[in-house]
Amino acid sequence: MLAGTRLLAQSPVVEVPLEFHDGHGLFAPGYGGVNWERGPNDNDWYKTYQPVKGIPASWKDVKKGNIWIDAHQFAYQNYRAGLLQADVYQGLKEGWKIDTTQLSPKPIRCFVYVVTGTTSDGKQGVLVDTNHDLDFTDERVVYPPTMLSIWKTGPLQEAIVSLPADFYRGGQVVTYPVKVLFALSDGNVLYNYPTYASASIRSGAKPSR
């Protein structure tokens, strides 16, 4: 075992360029749930909610919430803004192992607001605040397919929304495009990021150091 460890330690590091693709590739996709807003009772996140506008008046059973693109950054910036209690944040910091040296001290676009409801034609629609202005008036209605249909046919482009998001890298805030795929499971709106990477290396190629 020790000999194998020494050999591994002496092996050169191989750097392989990645190529990113839309979809899930050969991987089984996982999904997350939207953080829907709820009342103030026993709700540590209540003060982090922001008012939005532009929700169609004809929609019924409307729910409003957000997706945390970077949950660590979201918790940290709301704590610094006084919108998340210190004891709650400290618990998250320990449980999530939040490293504040890797996070922006100023608020950035690390989340996105989402609303869902029953449209006038009886379908379940989703609106995403892709330009982060808290106004859904100019947003495209997405009709999420069921997870079963996605498993059979793959991600549907009309169920994918693209938006800019901010990240803290190397002491600077950088912006990257993020794609979000929405799906329905028993009426619940779920999402994931339909992007995967591939790499290839020629047999006998010399690794870079």
Positions of the model-derived regions?
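Sec/Tat signal peptide C-region and signal peptidase I cleavage site
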Residues: 5-9
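Calcium-binding acidic motifs and repeat modules
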Residues: 10-209
